[in-house]
Amino acid sequence: MLNPLNFITKFIKSSNQKELDRINKIVVKVNSLEASVKNLSDEDFPKKTTELKDKLKNGENLDTLLPEAFALVREASKRTRNERHHDVQILGGVVLHEGKIAEMRTGEGKTLTISLAAYLNALTEEGVHIVTVNDYLAKRDSQEMGEIYKFLGLTFGFINNDQDDLERKKNYNFDITYATNSELGFDYLRDNMKFSKEQMVQRGHVYTIVDEIDSCLIDEARTPLVISGAAEDKTEQYLAIDKLIKRLLPEHYEIDEKDRNILLTNEGINNVEKIFSDAGILKNNNFYDPENLSLVHHVNQSLRAHHLFEKGKDYIVKDGTLKIIDELTGRILEGRRFGDGLHQALEAKERIDVQAENQTLASITYQNYFKLYNKISGCTGTAATESQEFYEIYNLVVVIIPTNKEMIRKDWNDQIFRTEEEKNKAIIEKVLECHKQGQPILVFTSSINKSEIYSKLLNDEKIKHVVLNAKNHENEAEIIANAGKMNSVIITTSISGRGVDIQLGGKKGSQPDDELLENKNKIKSLGGLFVIGTERMESRRVDNQARGRAGRQGDEGSSIFYVSLEDDLMRIFGSESMNNILQKLGLKDGESIDHPWINKALERAQQKVEARNFDIRKNLLKFDDVLNDQRHVIFSQRNGVMNSEKVFDYSDEFLSEIISHLISLKTQKLSTTKNNEFNNQLKTLLGKSVDDNEFKNVTELKDEEFKNKINSKFLEARNERIKMLDEEKAKEVEKRIFLQCIDLNWKSHIQYLEQLRQVIGLRSYGQRDPLVEYKKEAFFLFENLLNKLKMDFVTILINLKIVQEPSESISRPLKKETSNDPNCLLIKRKNEKISRNEKCEATGKKFKNCCGAL
């Protein structure tokens, strides 16, 4: 059977050259304008930008403006940064403008390439978002490329974690904005929780360029962005369960490392029932009794925490806080927590403060966030291996851009050992061999724990080195920039794969130019930077990123991977008969082997993992699309009301729907059930606005009279508000109430869907498709949400009474009475900010109702 991944890869190779040939014709046009643009004065460039904007407004499109725009950016870069865009960068710029992915090797100048498409698309004056992998790069790239944009007459800015809303809004209103994917996503969610358009910071989603697009859309696709609030505190339960779980033995559970799952055996279930019954936690002496569902969930999470999640690999504990480590990048994911109670289970395991669970207020995945943009493009050094996923999920085509200079890096065949100990010994010997000559070495490991193991082995050999991992990443950029120095030895996790070029001889400016050049030539003669991979990662793309640190822009360099059969990849996904194959090939203890059979086995193992992860992401997206469609409806309705000048029309429409529904129930109320439903809903709606006698009379009215009665009650309450406030303020009250009703009901709805997702998989045991079942249930819940939202909104409006604030004459005596009281908050907390709900000892009232009301 044809492997679809292989087919796609072959298709890309055959079609890629055709695409490059087509784009090269555009590059020729750009080059033909270079001489004329060179004759422009500095003052002419902003004028040219204005001319291009005018042409766009007069009917020309961006494609026709591209050659002149790119020529202007190239010349502006030469004058401001002394950097001229190479033809391959012009190629990449065209690919980005066309909404595709440009695969460009490390060191080929992706940041400069992005400036071309960013400038062209900024001419629309609708904003361009450039996505970077961290805050440091957002600020750096904005400032460096900002020199070009400013010269051309464009505005630019960046978004960082410590900015307030005013600063964020200002930066989003610039022509070009640099930000991380998480900042963009969270700002979108927060904007859809605001109460006025003026409070929102983003202005739309038109065009985005994602730097290191594979990291954002592939690696982080499974991680949703979540804004959460405090939920019920179950701290003691987590601690109690953790204590009891430690009493289980290995025969009480089975571990599935492939799917990262753990299941209790029959013996384990019996043991759990005894342990938890003795502790008084289990109900009805049956672990799987419906009343113990919460307990089952917490036990499973505690088991996963103890046996599937490893400190130093999946997380670290720093300053008493448990922090997640990204499995692919090796970075700490600041501010993120494992969901579904797993984070609390890990905190209990590590005996640190267990923080309360959070309830989701709003969430979105990166997959669905980036689908908000009219056009998306990106660049990376490693996209071809994931081309099928990019096309299938995002409809993005990958175009492989040739290097400016020929790639001369040597990628040696993998060295395979039987045991990890033999492999480690060989790695240290290789480091010693290269280090004696002064050749710079970059050693890649899969986790913090592994990096510390190799550090200890090098310390034993008295080799000076630097360890770079999530524990000590503060000087990452500086360390990596100088990784090309003589005698440099750096041990790192995948953290050092992005954003910073390694220059042979050292970072420019770190030493005199002549000394730098001399050192560079020495290192070239030694073979350049030597990259050592201590094992194959689960993704070929991550391996390629490691290789890509060497051999930038035609420099010398080399790479090699050392592999053992005890490595996680081979142990979990490799063939069980691999050891027998090595024995047949005559591999002796301590020896390595390089053989096509082994390389094929490694490739198959990685493809298994890649295919499995792709399926997981595809499946998650199918489920998330259900929530995404509902999110779109809710956010659209919310924004519609928030931005509307005719909020009364929304209220009247909802009232009309509710009355029609009640009349429908009224005509069916022959049955006791329908009668109760009608009475309950009508009582809820009218609340305290009618007494029992009037309520009875309303239920007996004919349909038209019934409708008029409810309408009159609603309008009576509204007119009272208008009389006391004025019409504009009354509209603002209705608008604010509606937005709060949406937020409250949406929050509950998300929680219901999360709970549904956790259990829907069980439907497969009844020969039902979990996805189909989830869609049905989610649709039913969404219908209920919309109905409840309207009922809550109209009910509040009918029953809402505006209370007149105390007049000036009533307030003054209070001030006089308390102004000299030493317990008065205004005196006790002079010049300090006082909470509106803080109790004032002078009056016994909340601050907002006494001194704070003055």
Curated annotation (Swiss-Prot):
GO biological process: intracellular protein transmembrane transport; protein import; protein targeting; protein transport by the Sec complex
UniProt topology in membrane: Peripheral membrane protein
Top-level taxon: Bacteria
Catalytic activity: ATP + H2O + cellular proteinSide 1 = ADP + phosphate + cellular proteinSide 2
Protein keywords: ATP-binding, Cell inner membrane, Cell membrane, Cytoplasm, Membrane, Nucleotide-binding, Protein transport, Translocase, Translocation, Transport
InterPro entries: Helicase_ATP-bd, Helicase_C-like, P-loop_NTPase, SecA, SecA_DEAD, SecA_motor_DEAD, SecA_preprotein_X-link_dom, SecA_SF2_C
UniProt EC number: 7.4.2.8
Gene3D superfamilies documented for this protein: Helical scaffold and wing domains of SecA, P-loop containing nucleotide triphosphate hydrolases, SecA, preprotein cross-linking domain
GO cellular component, one term: cytosol
Keyword DNA repair: no
Matches recorded under SMART domains: HELICc, SecA_DEAD, SecA_PP_bind
Keyword Phosphoprotein recorded: no
Gene Ontology MF terms in the entry: ATP binding; protein-exporting ATPase activity
Principal subcellular localization: membrane
Intracellular or extracellular location(s): Cell inner membrane; Cytoplasm
Residues that, per the record, bind ATP: Q89, G107, E108, G109, K110, T111, D501
Pfam families noted in UniProt: P-loop_SecA (PF21090), SecA_DEAD (PF07517), SecA_PP_bind (PF01043), SecA_SW (PF07516)
Listed PANTHER family: CHLOROPLAST PROTEIN-TRANSPORTING ATPASE, SECA INNER MEMBRANE COMPONENT OF SEC PROTEIN SECRETION SYSTEM
Protein role: Part of the Sec protein translocase complex. Interacts with the SecYEG preprotein conducting channel. Has a central role in coupling the hydrolysis of ATP to the transfer of proteins into and across the cell membrane, serving both as a receptor for the preprotein-SecB complex and as an ATP-driven molecular motor driving the stepwise translocation of polypeptide chains across the membrane.
Alphabetized NCBIfam families for the sequence: PRK09200.1, PRK12904.1, secA
Subunit structure: Monomer and homodimer. Part of the essential Sec protein translocation apparatus which comprises SecA, SecYEG and auxiliary proteins SecDF-YajC and YidC.
UniProt record similarity statement: Belongs to the SecA family.
Protein name: Protein translocase subunit SecA
Natural source organism: Pelagibacter ubique (strain HTCC1062)
